[in-house]
Amino acid sequence: MRGFRPLLSLLLPLSACFPLLDRRGPTDIGDIGARMNWAQLAEGHPPNSVQNPQPQALLVVAREQQASHREHTGFRLGRQDGSSEAAGFLPADSEKASGPLGTLAEELSSYSRRKGGFSFRFGR
């Protein structure tokens, strides 16, 4: 019994430094409470705080923004000479095929190889 008291007096202050974690298991795979460190728990941040958004939610938001951006990209180039809207995106036989990256660069910089130079748009 005498050897138990010094050990208890050492472990009791340690239990005050490290709070007990939630004994329930994680509710889903992306549970943030399972990955929190002791410093965040000591500061009092709840496990599902706004400071630590779930990565799956961020991925869904990013995909939605990319999808909505793709819907509007064809209408930014202004008037096109071709009969269809997609004619401006397809390279002619004499032009080098640049792919989606080159098309995006042309759209962002207002440079058109088909027209032979820069075209400036006012208002943006």
UniProtKB/Swiss-Prot annotation:
Residues 63-101 are annotated as: Disordered. Pfam families: RFamide_26RFa. Residues 18-79 form a propeptide. The modification Phenylalanine amide is found at F122. Its main location: secreted. GO terms for cellular component: extracellular region. Residues 1-17 form the signal peptide. Belongs to the RFamide neuropeptide family. Ligand for the G-protein coupled receptor QRFPR/GPR103. This is Orexigenic neuropeptide QRFP. It comes from Mus musculus.
